[in-house]
Amino acid sequence: MRSFFAASLVLLISSAFMIAQESSKPSGEEGHLRALESAWNHAEQSKDAAALNQLLADSFVYVDYDGTLMNKKQFLASTINGEVQNEQINNEGMTVQVYGDAAVVNGAYRDKGLEKGKPFSRHGRFTDTWIFRNGTWQCVASQSTLIRQ
């Protein structure tokens, strides 16, 4: 009887260890959302309006680092209009939390380029809220905040 309990205890502990290892691995959705964040950076850098249009929901709301509030149409226009030429946009330290058909992505970013002909280099944090509907993930809200240098 004692050996049965010992074997059961070993099995229980090893099962708990395996479950803990599995939960620390990113899910398929987490990896997909990280890829979408990278695709967003690439689309913004290359001023790809079609790609951005697919990534952003029609109800998209953006709060820029300076407090500017934009809807999807305004965000696309500001990204495509040419005032900002992003040479580089990189995300760092992203965390992804999936809640069924919704997800929140937090992280830091670094971007540099030209704005109205003047060089800039920014480091900030962002929060993006994504929803899954009609078979695809789309961002419904994004907010960025500059990190003081």
Kindly give the residue locations of the regions a language model identified.
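A beta-strand edge to alpha-helix "cap/lid" segment located at domain peripheries
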Residues: 4-5, 19-149
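Bacterial N-terminal signal peptides
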Residues: 6-16
